[in-house]
Amino acid sequence: VRYVKVAWEHDFVDEPVLYLSELGGDGYEIRKVQFYRDGRSEWADESHETANSGLAEIPFPPLEEISGQEGLSAEWIDREEFERAWGEAQIDY
């Protein structure tokens, strides 16, 4: 299991600015949290999705590929950082 954080710099009000994902050994998302500029958060796992937050249907791409796109930066994070964000999103829900 690995954890990744992707920041997205943009001017869209209704789009997330930060994504944190838990990835399985096959590269597919197990859980995801996304945060918005206004402080809102949403989350998804195998049993819960929203209209705006769901697990990807394809394996997570290499970090270099993500960070190579304008406005995006990706980095590996530790489990503790992901779990803090996951817990925060659960409280907001």
Region spans (language model):
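Short, extreme N-terminal segment that most often corresponds to the first beta-strand
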Residues: V1-E15
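Broad, structure-driven detector of short, well-ordered beta-strand segments within folded domains
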Residues: E15-G24
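Acidic, aromatic-enriched beta-alpha/helix-loop junctions
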Residues: L23-G68
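Short, compact, well-ordered microdomains
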Residues: I58-Y93
